């Protein structure tokens, strides 16, 4: 038996004399200059983030059955950046402000793992249990007004997962999870953008969701050089419910679109192990959702785009043990996502927030002598330019041009008896580029360069 207890506290606030200056999307970066921040602004960052869990593990609590039970909780308060009142795009009743997130969670999970042995060629693992999560969250402004009221949810979810191996080489996975979620929404007033907008007073109530989701997978591994697999799974989430409620246009919950997002996910691929020195992996996946979860900008605010969506892509990887002390590898991921337009055609691309640019990563690991290592890593992210400027000649937020990035990182280390020393140099060539977030968001004030060369020395002492 084993009992494990963990507590973690994190706090990070930004107190700086610098304020943003300049910045023109696709032309010049925003930089920090000495200045005074707005007197209404407070330090942004995480005021507190408490995390704790208690875990109990028991091997063979019953015959051929292990138990893992845990209780966990967290409490978070994060303040975002200050937004100056902008008459062209008013928000929060035409005032300046700073939004925040307050979140509290408490959960319980009990999981059993049973082993069934029918013969040398047929056996099964069964994982089954129960999840419970209590979550209370809100999005206030630091001045006391509520952009999103306190939402309280309870999620009960029993689950079952079976993995069976037949004839030693055929693996079958089958599972299911039933979610029962109730969300309590209080009576609240929608925080208007303009004072002239009609006041919407929403009558609260209880939102209830019940969903059964399944997954199934097959794999065959008799031949090391070709091990195919295929899988199907269903996804379920009440994605961005708070974002929907804070932009409500109706006064009762029944008139507000609060339906959950359900996805059907398909994957097919193969794994190959060639003489234990070269491993190859490739897969193609496809996901469809009748009710989408992409985000779009509406009068300066993010809202959920409920248009049907599909996402597809490929993932490829290769790892080679060239020498006993030399290893190299690469992996490639490419995604694309489209929305179904009013004409019934899949002719609209999903935003850069949901779909990243293609990514290629390569590495070389070398151990020149015992207890030392060197790693050189190259990362390339591709270009994603799927959208045209709007009528005013500007790119909508989330639809900006994401340009190519090429980075080289170096890590070296040595393991000694009393400590481990490591040296990491990120962006080794001091490559100048804009952050992907600033490129996709297309905001002048946030169009900023990423970090240049950064050197980190770490020492871990053993006792």
Protein language model regions, located:
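Transmembrane beta-strands of outer-membrane beta-barrel pores
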Residues: 9-13, 73-77, 132-138, 178-184, ...
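Outer-membrane beta-barrel translocator domains and adjoining extracellular loop/strand segments
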Residues: 16-24, 79-88, 137-145, 184-193, ...
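Extracellular loop and loop/strand-boundary signature of outer-membrane beta-barrel proteins
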Residues: 35-43, 55, 91-100, 139-150, ...
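C-terminal beta-signal and adjacent terminal beta-strands/loops
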Residues: 328, 370-371, 380-389, 413-463
């Amino acid at each position: 038996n084993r009992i494990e207890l963990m507590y973690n506290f994190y706090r990070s606030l930004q107190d700086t004399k610098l304020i943003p200056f300049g910045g023109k999307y696709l032309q010049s970066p925003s930089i920090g200059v000495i200045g005074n921040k707005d007197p209404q602004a407070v330090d942004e960052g995480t005021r507190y983030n408490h995390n704790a869990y208690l875990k109990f593990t028991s091997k063979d609590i019953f015959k051929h059955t292990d138990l893992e039970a845990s209780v966990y909780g967290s409490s978070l308060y994060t303040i975002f950046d200050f937004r100056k009142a902008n008459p062209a795009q008013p928000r929060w009743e035409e005032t300046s402000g700073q939004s925040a997130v307050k979140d509290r969670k408490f959960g319980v999970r009990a999981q059993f793992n049973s082993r069934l042995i029918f013969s040398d060629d047929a056996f099964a693992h069964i994982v089954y249990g129960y999840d419970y999560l209590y979550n209370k969250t809100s999005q206030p402004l630091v001045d006391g007004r509520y952009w999103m009221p306190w939402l309280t949810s309870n999620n009960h979810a029993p689950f079952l997962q079976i993995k069976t191996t037949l004839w030693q080489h055929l693996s079958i996975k089958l599972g299911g999870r039933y979610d029962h979620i109730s969300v309590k929404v209080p009576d609240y007033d929608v925080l208007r953008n303009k004072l002239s907008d009609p006041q919407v007073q929403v009558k609260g109530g209880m939102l209830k969701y019940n969903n059964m989701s399944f997954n199934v997978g097959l794999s065959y591994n008799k031949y090391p050089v070709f091990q195919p697999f295929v899988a199907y799974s269903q996804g379920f989430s009440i994605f961005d419910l708070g974002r929907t409620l804070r932009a409500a246009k109706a006064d009762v919950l029944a008139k507000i679109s609060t339906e959950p997002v359900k996805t059907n996910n398909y994957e097919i691929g193969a794994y190959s192990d060639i003489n234990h020195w070269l491993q190859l992996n490739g897969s193609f996946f496809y996901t469809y959702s009748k009710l989408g979860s992409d985000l779009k900008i509406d009068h300066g605010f993010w809202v959920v785009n409920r248009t049907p969506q599909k996402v597809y892509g490929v993932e490829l990887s290769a790892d080679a043990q060239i020498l006993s002390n030399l290893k190299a590898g690469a992996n490639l991921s490419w995604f694309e996502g489209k929305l179904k337009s009013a004409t019934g055609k899949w002719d609209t691309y999903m935003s850069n927030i949901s779909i990243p640019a293609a990514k290629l990563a390569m590495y070389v690991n070398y151990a020149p002598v015992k207890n030392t290592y060197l790693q050189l890593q190259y990362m390339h992210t591709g270009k994603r330019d799927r959208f045209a400027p709007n009528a005013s000649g500007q790119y909508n937020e989330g639809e900006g041009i994401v340009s190519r990035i090429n980075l080289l990182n170096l890590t070296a280390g040595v393991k000694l008896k009393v400590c481990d020393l490591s040296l990491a140099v990120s962006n080794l060539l001091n490559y100048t580029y804009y952050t992907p977030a600033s490129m996709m968001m297309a905001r002048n004030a946030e169009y900023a360069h990423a970090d240049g060369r950064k050197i980190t020395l770490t020492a871990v002492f053993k006792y």
